[in-house]
Amino acid sequence: MLSSAFIAQINEILAPDEVEKLCLTLTETMPPVSIRLNPKKLLTPPSKCPSPYVEPQPSSGAFDLLALKDGRVPWCSQGFYLKQRPTFTIDPLLHAGAYYVQEASSMFVEQAYKRILAESEPQTLLDLCAAPGGKSTLWRSLLPDGALLVANEPIRPRAHILEENLLKWGHPDVVCTSAFPAEFARLKEFFDVVAADVPCSGEGMFRKDPNACAEWSHKAVAICAQRQWEIIRDIWPALRTGGFLVYSTCTFNQKENEEMLVQICRELGAQLIEIPVEKAWHIAGSTLQSNARPMPVYHFFPHLVRGEGFFLALLQKTSGTANHQEFKSKSHSPKRFGMKETFFKTSTSKFVPTTEPQTKSSKTTKRPAPKLDPTTCLSESQHFQLLSTGETIFAVRQTLFQEVQQICSTVKTLHAGIPLAELKGTNLVPHPALALSSEFNTNAFPTIELSYPQALAYLRREALTLPANLPKGHAIASYLSHPLGFLNNLGPRANNLYPQNWRIRNL
């Protein structure tokens, strides 16, 4: 049930007949279902099983996602609508990062990126409020290889969800951080683009989230607007002069949208940039009643577009001056993410324990640091340099190494580049996310092609019966040629190495 206060607010920005249509849409229709494909993991089932260790079995119970397609999202090249909402959790390809379930309206950021390209080619982009990762994975697919995406989420539980989705998406040129906007102020004019999908009152998501409808109030709108202003003000020093701010919300009201943009332009120094759109998309413009030239802003109203409520504007920073008190806190030590050029050494064995097996007649013989030949794990390892934090080793593109180190030494970093390996006890083992990387060399390990039931069992972290001819050691668990993760074949049994916190808990 929509509150009378909310309806009164909508009457201030829309004509009466439009208000009625919007309210009916919000209360009596279901939101459309849409997905976006991963261009580096295209959904093209192989004509034959690539693994010599097991023959593919009938995909009992599997659904064909491509058969559910119901047209393209017109403003996103990889976006598709579906005829119905399947149970995505039981599709192994979702867990492989082959696609992302994303609300269609929010895919409009692709058009903002195209407009930015008309002015410059951004090399550094910060997605400031990024969880759960829909827009971040889209930004990463839009940016060219060699450009850096920093995906940030200050709330730690949400940050780990963001990290999981980014790792499954598999692009190497990503840093995932968990910091508040003011902490980035030390990175003066570092980013070419800042995308801020700021926390809002959630009016555009009433169909998806009944709680947002129940909790809505004018007070909540005012609180959100104040928070949004603080977020943009705090991040402003990190955006280079001439760089771009992509500001978005999932709400309709002017206080969180048009009025916020006026404040940003006036107090921080920015200008609004127009984004070309097609009339057939039915995207609305500014709701401000003014005789002046309409603001170039983009409203997605659910009764007009096939999507949820969404608002976006593109701004260009014209001034670096702002009344800003620089955030001061204990900096993160650069040693946390340190260079490890000598850590890896060529070895005939991919993963070698740090100690010899101990017997009754011998003492443990210590070895140097664990050895791994990274050239066997990455398809183009010559382009990457190594970082370590704690017991995890990451591979970072050489051309981005300096920037990544600067970020890691400034804000809390969850991962940087490709998680390559981690130390477990005395053994160096492949990181679970390595198998999901688009740079992963699948020839480095034997591959076992799983049937649909086997893939679900693997994703539940259940034990699997492996073919007798599968070599001992680490192997790739794959479904329709998309790696899901690793197994460790011990001979009579195999350890399922799928991460505990990623497993499917309920079917």
Language model segments and positions:
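Polybasic, low-complexity RNA-engagement segments
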Residues: 1-42, 62-64, 318-507
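Mobile active-site "lid"/loop adjacent to the S-adenosyl-L-methionine
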Residues: 157, 192-234, 250-257, 282
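Helix-to-beta-strand junctions that scaffold the AdoMet/dcAdoMet cofactor pocket
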Residues: 144, 239-241
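S-adenosyl-L-methionine
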Residues: 154-188
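Conserved AdoMet
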Residues: 33-45, 65-107
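Conserved class I S-adenosyl-L-methionine
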Residues: 121-129
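A short acidic, Gly/Pro-enriched loop at the edge of an enzyme's catalytic core
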Residues: 121, 185-195
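Conserved SAM-binding loop of SAM-dependent methyltransferases across substrates and taxa
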Residues: 132-145
